[in-house]
Design a protein with these regions (language model features):
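Signature of the catalytic double-stranded beta-helix
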Residues: 54-70
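N-terminal secretory/targeting leader peptides
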Residues: 1-51, 69, 73-259
Length: 259
């Protein structure tokens, strides 16, 4: 149940220590355990959903990128194994007023996960970015402590944010919300070969089914949000956003254990 084992960061730490067998941690937060995960938050690394989990997707089960990510997470942490990956779609910007150009971000207080890559990206674009736990976000938006946040549209709908942030910058598509299912390595190694095979197979099937479901529901989610009074806008200078963000990649590579 929500909140029983604590926040993502707390749950991830418990998996690392072995006091919890499994946790779901978004890539934006998992970088604190394994720097290589920060690469999943690079702006404009993924050009669309198919790049993530499509037939040739970087994170599709069995891909070379996925295998390398699994190895590096285990090497970095010594105790955390990547068992599954998922995405709820690309992060879009949700605000109290329309944002159609970079200059509109001036003065906006933006809630972010504790990701140095994402924070640097948004500050480069001109927003005032603040790291905040997800559990605190709804109240902060509701009370006006924060003006905006970014997530996939299904989060805006299912978590009831739309009365407070009813404008969406729809064509931003700078970064997907990726989550990792991590298990404690010592616990995993105690499983029988049959149990490991079952777990790995179930995880792979679930990943692809979830990806297909998220893709299929996007239009319906958008329609429901429009019916709730949410307005969708395009950013007019989105190519400038992209250029400014990609220029930061060399700095981000260092944050991810690269060069």
């Amino acid at each position: 149940p929500n909140g029983v084992v604590g926040s993502e960061m707390v749950a991830g730490q418990k998996v690392k220590q072995g006091t919890l067998q499994m946790a779901i941690v978004t890539a934006a937060n998992a970088g604190s355990f394994s720097p290589c995960v920060n690469v999943l938050t690079f702006p404009y690394l993924f050009s669309g959903p198919e790049d993530i989990m499509g037939e040739k997707g970087y994170l599709r089960p069995g891909s070379a990128f996925r295998e390398e990510l699994t190895k590096r997470i285990l090497a970095d942490t010594g105790s955390m194994r990547l068992i599954a990956v998922g995405t709820n779609g690309f992060r879009l910007l949700f605000t109290k007023k329309p944002v159609t150009k970079m200059g509109d971000l001036k003065g906006i207080k933006l809630r972010l996960a504790a990701s140095p890559v994402m924070q640097r990206t948004w500050e480069t674009w001109g927003a005032s970015a603040y790291a905040m736990a997800w559990s605190e976000t709804f109240t902060a938006i509701q009370q006006g402590v924060m003006d905006a946040f970014e997530c996939p549209t299904n989060i805006l709908l299912y978590n009831g944010f739309y009365p407070y942030t009813n404008h969406v910058a729809e064509n931003l598509y700078y970064c997907p919300q990726i989550f990792l299912i991590l298990v404690n390595e010592r616990w995993y190694q105690k499983l029988s070969p049959e149990q490991k095979s079952f777990l790995n197979e179930a995880a792979a099937i679930n990943e692809l089914e979830h990806f297909a479901w998220v893709q299929a529901e996007y239009d319906d989610v958008r329609k429901q949000l429009v019916n709730h009074g949410v307005e969708f806008h395009d950013i007019n200078d989105v190519e400038q956003w992209k250029a400014n963000a990609i220029a930061l990649w060399p700095d981000f590579a260092e944050m991810s254990g690269g060069k």
